[in-house]
């Protein structure tokens, strides 16, 4: 189910990612949730929500990486 605000994100996202990364996750999740409504568009199996979570985490990892227990921007800023 789409997230309307960062406050609605799962704890594993909201409590660990910086605000900007949460925004990226939420926007990517919502877009993917809409796109993968049709099961024929899901290439790795699983449900619509699982597919959207995979896409959202991939989007976060394009801009952030985990350094120890913190997520930091790839560009160091």
Give the location of each predicted region:
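C-terminal alpha-helical interaction appendages
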Residues: 1-77
